[in-house]
């Protein structure tokens, strides 16, 4: 996992999630929060979490599972990751 502390893209995703969650919390403290607005915000959070999961899985595969990066068919790997994002 040591490679993750240097990954700015993943850290930025986490920071955006933090901001989105903070926005939901703030909306819930309003006198009459809009259920639709909150549901839209939560749906965005869900999408962001799924994106983060996909990115972490790809990093894990590339750093810890694939033993020989030269032996990997990059097109097949990308197809697998695409399926994982869609159905995972």
Residues covered by each model-derived region:
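Solvent-exposed interaction patches of small proteins and small membrane subunits
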Residues: 1-88
């Amino acid at each position: 996992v040591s490679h993750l502390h240097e990954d700015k893209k993943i850290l930025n995703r986490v920071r955006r999630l933090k901001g989105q969650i903070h926005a939901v919390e703030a909306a819930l403290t309003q006198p009459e929060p809009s259920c639709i607005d909150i549901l839209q915000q939560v749906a965005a959070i869900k999408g962001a979490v799924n994106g983060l999961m996909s990115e972490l899985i790809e990093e894990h595969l590339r750093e810890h599972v694939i033993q020989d990066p030269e032996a990997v068919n990059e097109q097949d790997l990308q197809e697998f990751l695409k399926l994982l994002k869609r159905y995972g």
